[in-house]
């Protein structure tokens, strides 16, 4: 052992790591992960097919055990684990993995459900018919052979490949620092593209796409949109969307609809897909599905999704596409080896490299065949002369003492012959070559019959024509391209089939809003921070003084604090107690029943400790001419442009810098010309002009809006309109309507006037809203009881009155929220 390291070389570890890793990376790139652009195969696939070729494991021969093939591959050509080789064989035999299978398998080779193949000792394989086109002309010196890993065998550096395998079967692999993901295509279309390129190598991409419109996956499906295809074909990189194919079936008995999926996207595991759908239904992320079954059999795929009678199949379908692998994005990255170097290729470049490869193969094949044909023609020429002079030749052979002497006598003699026009000589003198003499000496006696003589002449004539044709192919590129074209047409006729994947013009980008049904909803936020929305249609209008319906199941110490009526597609601006604004879509909130309490908003927004949402504002559209007007409990107001809040951030943005112990109580949209009304819990109100407050930046603190007493605070912010009245409600369930004209316009920062007479009976103000006759209002108590009342049923009273009963509350029950509903039901 002491003699193993006789010399130690000191090297810099950084340089050694760099050099060694680079060697490893190139080994993976060239020798394992990336296909060659010429035959579309990685080394392992090429070695598998060559090993089967050596074994004569052809499509028209008997199957051989997979283990036999694996053993030959790893023993002779591929010094890696048997599982890596067998996994490659399995994939080459799966009709859902390769568009055109290269191996014909017998036995269990796995399934689209992700089931593993049987062990290689149980399965049998042979080459498929099309795979032999990859190896055609291999024995005609068409490709170079290189030593195997130990130098005991030789393997082809590349396969001759008559088929454009890189495109028709695609390829995927991850190397070091790069990856490839080439989708499969239809053979007919790819060959049509090749023929068009042969006809005009200056063909444009747009013209080429007329022949090759896009990928064609073995699992069919639908490709949505052509933009990604064109981008990938032009640059080598792009993204396409593959969608499952479905149909809607209606049950004749119960009239319920079912969505039937009978084609799924490429490389999607069907079993996991069904599990995901079931999980989404269980989590109630998809509502409306009543049953889910896999009815797939030997005749085809069939995934059945039964939906509720009242559910809309289009919405559920879009939700399934968005949330599951029923629609996937396929990233195209056409990287392949070109002359041993990885390169990102366009569609046109791939065709160019393949056809250049075919030209090289046809050239080498023609040279090989020409040499072989010329040698045979030379022999036939000698035999023809010998048959003319057969008697003389026989005499020489008889006189010779040995075969060597006979050969020398025949070579030295000058021969005279007739029919010279069939022999390429200028005169009648002829001298045999050594090869010709050997053929003459090997000639059997039965060849001397007249019939055999005619056969030799006919064969010679055929060879002469073949030599002429081969020389023409080698001299003329046009003729060579004709040969390539004819071979491609033959491949198309023998193996071409119909396209499976449909390509549509539809926009593949499914926005979440496309999946959500537009409907008016009630959004509630409890004092403890539980938020939810539920359809507005869940509530019917009641008479004044009714007991109401339960709007939320809440804990005894919790109560509903905020309630807004909005639409599922609107934006909710959530203003926190710290003056931070958070941006959400209504549909991002949890949808719950009336009896559910919803979800904690802290799970939806990144709120910090002791931070809570104090105001929510629904926004339908962010318009530049609108403002956000804010009011705090201490009477501070601030106006900022709505466009300041257009771009959300995950962590939120500053809406207002609050003073100590202050918080937001109201937010409203204004146009710069409105009036502003601030109502306090002790029954005060001030109305002033909006233009008395200048527009400020998001981080400003604001200005004084109303002067308040020590034990008072602002509870409502209203932007009034001329035709509306103000409805004021108290925590004991009292309320009234008062005309807006009864509230005088004062200067900003004054104490204001009386809005409602506060007594022990009616309690303090919990809120004020503006209403018209056709409006309805909602009131909610801290016990979770909700009542819906028509505004027209509430009397119009003067400012200095205490109001009438709007909702009857039980002991310790207080009204905590008030909201207007614009459109009555």
Curated annotation (Swiss-Prot):
Keyword set includes Nucleotide-binding:
yes
GO terms under biological process = DNA topological change; DNA-templated DNA replication
Q: Start and end of every Topo IIA-type catalytic domain?
A: 34-515
A molecular function (GO) term: DNA binding
Describe the protein's quaternary organization and the partners it interacts with: Heterotetramer, composed of two GyrA and two GyrB chains. In the heterotetramer, GyrA contains the active site tyrosine that forms a transient covalent intermediate with DNA, while GyrB binds cofactors and catalyzes ATP hydrolysis.
EC number(s) on record? 5.6.2.2
Is Cytoplasm among this UniProt entry's keywords?
Answer: yes
Corresponding gene? gyrA
Which protein is depicted?
A: DNA gyrase subunit A
Q: Where in the cell is it found?
A: Cytoplasm
Instruction: Report the Pfam families cross-referenced here.
Output: DNA_gyraseA_C (PF03989), DNA_topoisoIV (PF00521)
Checking InterPro entries in the record gives: GyrA, GyrA/parC_rep, Gyrase/topoIV_suA_C, Topo_IIA-like_dom_sf, Topo_IIA_A/C_ab, Topo_IIA_A_a_sf, Topo_IIA_dom_A, Type_II_DNA_Topoisomerases
- Source organism: Buchnera aphidicola subsp. Schizaphis graminum (strain Sg)
The UniProt entry lists the main location of this chain as cytoplasm
Main role? Answer: A type II topoisomerase that negatively supercoils closed circular double-stranded (ds) DNA in an ATP-dependent manner to modulate DNA topology and maintain chromosomes in an underwound state. Negative supercoiling favors strand separation, and DNA replication, transcription, recombination and repair, all of which involve strand separation. Also able to catalyze the interconversion of other topological isomers of dsDNA rings, including catenanes and knotted rings. Type II topoisomerases break and join 2 DNA strands simultaneously in an ATP-dependent manner.
Extract the CDD domains matched here. TOP4c
The active site annotation covers 122 (o-(5'-phospho-dna)-tyrosine intermediate)
């Amino acid at each position: 052992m002491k003699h193993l390291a006789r010399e130690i070389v000191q090297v810099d570890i950084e340089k050694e790591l760099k050099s060694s890793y680079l060697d490893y990376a190139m080994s993976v790139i060239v020798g394992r992960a990336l296909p060659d652009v010429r035959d579309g195969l990685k080394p392992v696939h090429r070695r598998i097919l060559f090993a089967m070729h050596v074994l004569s494991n052809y499509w028209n021969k008997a199957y051989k055990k997979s283990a036999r093939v694996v053993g030959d591959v790893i023993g002779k050509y591929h010094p890696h684990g048997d599982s890596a080789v067998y996994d490659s064989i399995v994939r080459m035999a799966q009709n859902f993995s390769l568009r055109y299978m290269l191996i014909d398998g017998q036995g269990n080779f796995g399934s689209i459900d992700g089931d593993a193949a049987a062990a290689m000792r149980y399965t049998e394989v042979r080459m498929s018919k099309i795979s032999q086109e990859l190896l055609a002309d291999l024995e005609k010196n068409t490709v170079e052979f290189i030593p195997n890993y130990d130098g005991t065998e030789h393997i082809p550096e590349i396969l001759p490949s008559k088929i454009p395998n890189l495109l028709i079967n695609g390829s995927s692999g991850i190397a070091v620092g790069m990856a490839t993901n080439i989708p499969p295509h239809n053979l007919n279309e790819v060959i049509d593209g090749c023929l068009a390129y042969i006809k005009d190598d200056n063909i444009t991409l747009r013209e080429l796409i007329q022949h090759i419109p896009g990928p064609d996956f073995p699992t069919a499906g639908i490709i949505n949109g052509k933009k990604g295809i064109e981008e990938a074909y032009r640059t080598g990189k792009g993204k396409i969307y593959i969608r499952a194919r479905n149909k809607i079936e209606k049950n004749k008995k119960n009239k319920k609809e079912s969505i039937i999926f009978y084609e799924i996207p490429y490389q999607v595991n069907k079993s996991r897909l069904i599990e995901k759908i079931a999980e989404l239904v269980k989590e109630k992320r998809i509502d409306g599905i009543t049953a889910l079954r896999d009815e797939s059999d030997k005749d085809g795929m069939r995934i059945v999704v039964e939906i509720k009678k009242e559910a809309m199949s289009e919405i559920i379908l879009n939700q399934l596409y968005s949330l599951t692998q029923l629609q996937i994005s396929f990233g195209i990255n056409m990287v392949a080896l070109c002359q041993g170097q990885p390169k990102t290729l366009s569609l046109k470049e791939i065709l160019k490299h393949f056809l250049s490869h075919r030209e090289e193969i046809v050239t080498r094949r023609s040279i090989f065949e020409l040499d072989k044909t010329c040698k045979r023609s030379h022999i036939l020429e000698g035999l023809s002369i010998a048959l003319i002079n057969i008697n003389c030749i026989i005499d020489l052979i008889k006189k010779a003492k040995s075969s060597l002497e006979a050969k020398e006598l025949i070579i030295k003699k000058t021969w005279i012959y007739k029919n010279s026009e069939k022999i390429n000589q200028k005169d009648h003198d002829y001298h045999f070559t050594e090869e010709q003499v050997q053929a003459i000496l090997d000639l059997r006696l039965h060849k001397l019959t007249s019939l055999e003589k005619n056969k030799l002449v006919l064969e010679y004539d055929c060879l002469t024509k073949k030599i002429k044709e081969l020389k023409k192919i080698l001299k003329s590129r046009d003729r060579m391209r004709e040969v390539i074209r004819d071979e491609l047409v033959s491949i198309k006729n023998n193996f071409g089939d119909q396209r499976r994947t449909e390509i549509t013009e539809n926009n593949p980008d499914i926005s979440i809003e496309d999946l959500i049904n537009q409907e008016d909803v009630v959004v509630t936020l409890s004092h403890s921070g539980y938020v939810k929305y539920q359809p507005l249609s869940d509530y019917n209008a009641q008479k004044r003084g009714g007991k109401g319906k339960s709007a939320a199941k809440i804990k005894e110490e919790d109560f509903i604090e905020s309630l807004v009526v909005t639409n599922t597609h609107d934006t909710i601006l959530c203003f926190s107690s710290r003056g931070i604004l958070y941006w959400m879509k209504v549909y991002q909130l949890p949808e719950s029943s009336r009896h559910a309490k919803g979800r904690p908003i802290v799970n939806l927004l990144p709120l910090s400790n002791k931070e809570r949402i104090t105001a929510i504002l629904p926004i339908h559209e962010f318009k530049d001419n609108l403002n956000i007007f804010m009011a705090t409990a201490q009477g501070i107001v601030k106006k900022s442009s709505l466009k300041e809040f257009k771009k959300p951030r995950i962590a939120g943005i500053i809406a207002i810098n609050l003073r100590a112990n202050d918080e937001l109580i109201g937010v409203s949209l204004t146009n710069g010309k409105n009036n502003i009304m601030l109502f306090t819990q002790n029954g005060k109100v001030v109305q002033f002009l909006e233009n008395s407050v200048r527009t400020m930046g998001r981080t400003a603190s604001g200005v004084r809006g109303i002067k308040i007493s020590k034990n008072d605070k602002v509870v409502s912010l209203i932007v009034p309109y001329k035709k509306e009245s103000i409805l004021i409600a108290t925590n004991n369930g009292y309320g009234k309507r008062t005309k807006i004209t009864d509230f005088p316009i004062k200067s900003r920062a004054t104490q204001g006037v009386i809005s409602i007479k506060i007594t022990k009976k009616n309690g303090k103000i919990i809120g004020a809203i503006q209403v018209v006759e056709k409006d309805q209002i909602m009131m909610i108590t801290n016990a979770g009881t909700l009542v819906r009342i028509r505004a027209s049923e509430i009397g119009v009273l003067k400012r200095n009155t205490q109001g009438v009963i709007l909702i009857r509350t039980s002991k310790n029950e207080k009204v905590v929220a008030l909201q207007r509903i614009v459109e009555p039901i």
